[in-house]
Amino acid sequence: METIKIKQANGSEKTVILPVRGMVGTLHVGSDRYVVCCKAVISNKKVRLMNIYDITEDNKDQYIYEKNGVEYLTDEAFNKFMRDGELYSLRKNGTWREVGIPTRESCCIVTFGYANPHLDPDF
């Protein structure tokens, strides 16, 4: 499986396994946030990372909004990143859990290290 290395707030790196089908979501690493989009392009063992967008204080309103303490992708981000894919959530061990074809409202942000329990009750 394809992996990416994410630098954590304490300076160490964590290897994250990418899914083998389309994915859009965000990674939280300490105070750093990234919108990630990838898609399977070669085989079930190779995926191509399409985009990683760093979310900064200056641009975060373009990509995420908060409702009831939960972050969601904005319409702009959802339409930009979602292309015939399915949403995957990041588990604590660095693997992805498929959560199905999302609507924008169900495209809930799953953070690096913890998840929204209503989206991933097994987390």
What residues fall within each predicted segment?
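Mixed-charge, low-complexity intrinsically disordered regions
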Residues: 1-34, 46, 50-123
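Residue-level recognition of beta-strand termini and adjacent short loop/turns
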Residues: 42-43
